[in-house]
Regions:
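Class I S-adenosyl-L-methionine-dependent methyltransferase module
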Residues: 45-131
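S-adenosyl-L-methionine
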Residues: 1-32, 37-38
Length: 131
């Protein structure tokens, strides 16, 4: 199963082996969510997904809240902004706009992840996304 994000350290390729070591129970706790590869490849009744990256958590919250709207907006952005200059404009708005909604920040985060270098997620000392 693939995930919506490209992510360094993604566990998709090792899931068949990793699943052998996961405990049985009603809930899987995933403290380092990343691409959520473990969650996507298992069928626990519930999950606790956590990560230190607030942009990543915001993305998952917005997708969970309104998946169809998220997909629709991302689809338009991916089609219309598939150029280098658009990437840098979106990154600029993602980093500096004070008027961007959490919903659009999540859409932009997905765009930056999918269009950036190998799905890397890196922030500079000022806390700005810089891939």
């Amino acid at each position: 199963m693939s995930t919506i994000l490209k992510w360094a350290g993604n566990k998709t390729a090792i899931m068949s082996e990793l699943k052998k070591h996961l405990p049985a129970g009603p809930r899987l706790v995933e403290p380092f969510a990343g691409s959520c590869a473990v969650m996507m490849a298992t069928d626990y009744p519930s999950y606790l997904v956590a990560d230190i990256n607030p942009d990543l958590i915001n993305l998952y919250k917005k997708v969970a809240a309104d998946c169809e709207s998220f997909i629709s907006r991302a689809r338009v952005l991916f089609k219309e902004a598939n150029r280098e200059v658009a990437y840098y404009n979106i990154r600029q708005e993602f980093n500096y706009s004070t008027e961007i909604t959490d919903f659009m920040k999540a859409v932009y985060f997905l765009y930056l992840n999918r269009h950036g270098y190998r799905g890397l997620c890196r922030y500079n000392k000022s806390g700005h996304f810089n891939i």
